[in-house]
Amino acid sequence: MKLLPILLLTPLLSFGQFKERAAIVAAGLIAGVADGQREVIVHNPHAYRYRHPNAREAWWNPDSTWRRADRYAGPLVFVADKYHLNQFIRQGMFVGQTTIVAVITVGDYKANGRILWGKLAINLLLMQGSYMLAKGLTHRYYDVFR
C-alpha cells in the first residue's frame, strides 16, 4: 500500500526537462519491445512459443488472423492478434515521441527565438537509441536456439 503513493509522488521530485526526456526514453523502450516481439512472432515463432508456452496460438499467431479478418475490419484491427497489437503500440509510441520532441523544439524556439540544435539532436538520439536498445534486448531475450 505504501508503494502507490510513492509511485504517484515520484514525478514531482524530477526536474521538468528530465521528465520530458524520461517520457521520450520510456516511449522508445515500449516501442522497441513491441517491435522486437512483433518481429519474433513473424520470423521465429518457435522461440516465442518456447518463452510463452501457455499463450493461445490464435492470439499470437498472425497466420490465423486472416480467418477472423471479417470481424476486425476497420480501425479496430489491433485487437485481432498480438502482431497487430504490437504494431499499433509501436506506431503509437513513435507518434508520442515525435510529438514530444516537436513540442520541446517549438517551445525552445518561442522562448529563445531560435532552434536549439544541440538539444534537438540529444532528444533525437535518445528517441532512436532507446528504441534500438529495447529492440535489441528483446531479440536477445527470444534468441534461445543459438
Please place each PLM-identified region on the residue numbering:
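Hydrophobic alpha-helical membrane segments
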Residues: Q17-R146
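Sec-dependent N-terminal signal peptides
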Residues: L3-L13
